[in-house]
Amino acid sequence: MKTSVKVHAALFVVSLIYAANYSISKDVMPRYMGPFGLVLLRIVGATLFFTIAHRLAAPHDRIIGRGDNLRSIASGVLGIGLNQLLFFSGLNLTSPINASLIQTIAPIVTVLASALLLSEKLTLRRVLGVGVAGLGAASIILSRSSTEAAGSNELLGDIYILLNATAFGIYLVIVMPLMRKYHPFTVLARIFLVGAVLAVPVGWQQAAAADYASFPPGIWAAVAYMVLCVTILAYLLNNWALKYASPALLGTYIYLQPALAVLIAVGLGKDHMSWERAGQGLLIFLGVFLVSRKPKPSQLAAVPPLGPVQD
């Protein structure tokens, strides 16, 4: 199987995991546990997993140098600590529909950050792809009502999600050099440890206050899904893909989440499909294609390469 096919498959699985998480998380919060408590369980669980995995798979691989260590700290703060604290705080207050809409700002941040920090070429095709995919995602979400699932302070929740999307978009850019230089487990163990330093002081009270004995099997399954799939598997696949794809491509796959969320709802009998939504989904896939398509050989000769791996 070609590496490019594996990359797109990994990113699709990540989008599917995140799409389901919007609804699954709302089943747990705030009735069974507060958002900060969930973040603590996710980050601590992932920290233990990636630390053990690093010891087994790459025990002699270490992040060295002042620049790389500072980059790993920034990645842990933005991509793990702030990212997850802001996301679950926002999702606790707003609706899954609003949250998935605002998340589509992340690719825009990623493209701009790539141009500023990595000197990645901001081509017309890439800008057009981001715009087309954003139009498809926005049209899906705006065509649905989001008031029933919102919390008590929807505006504040929307602001938290906006900040979360911004932090994640920048994280994709700054962590990429580390993922291409070190073993993925080395990087993930470090950045989750940094995230845990932020999450433990904030979330330990909510985690300790939860009545775990009252959790039905479905809630335990939801918590396990958020720790194993949303945190460990999704971050592992995302960061592996960064070795072969540009941050802009990873960011653009966020646009798949609203479309996949609709398909999940249809499969569960909670929503219905229409020709309008099918067209909106096609817009999203067209945008992903425009961002990820390789340039022609003639274009490669005229434009300097962006880095060791072309998207």
Predicted regions: what is each one?
Residues 3-7, 32-36, 40, 64-70, ...:
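Juxtamembrane helix-entry segments on the extracytoplasmic side of multipass membrane proteins
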Residues 28, 38, 42, 90, ...:
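Hydrophobic/aromatic residues within transmembrane alpha-helices
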Residues 50, 113, 122-144, 199, ...:
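Hydrophobic transmembrane alpha-helices of multi-pass small-molecule transport proteins
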Residues 1-41, 150-177, 197, 201, ...:
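Glycine-/small-residue-enriched transmembrane alpha-helix faces in small-molecule transporters
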Residues 17, 21-22, 51-103, 139, ...:
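Specific transmembrane alpha-helical segments of multi-pass solute transporters/efflux pumps
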Residues 21, 45-49, 102-116, 131, ...:
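Alpha-helical transmembrane segments of compact multi-pass small-molecule transporters, enriched
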Residues 30-82, 109, 166-174, 188-207, ...:
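Transmembrane alpha-helices of multi-pass small-molecule transport proteins
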Residues 38-41, 80, 84, 98-105, ...:
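Helix-helix packing/entry segments at the starts of transmembrane helices
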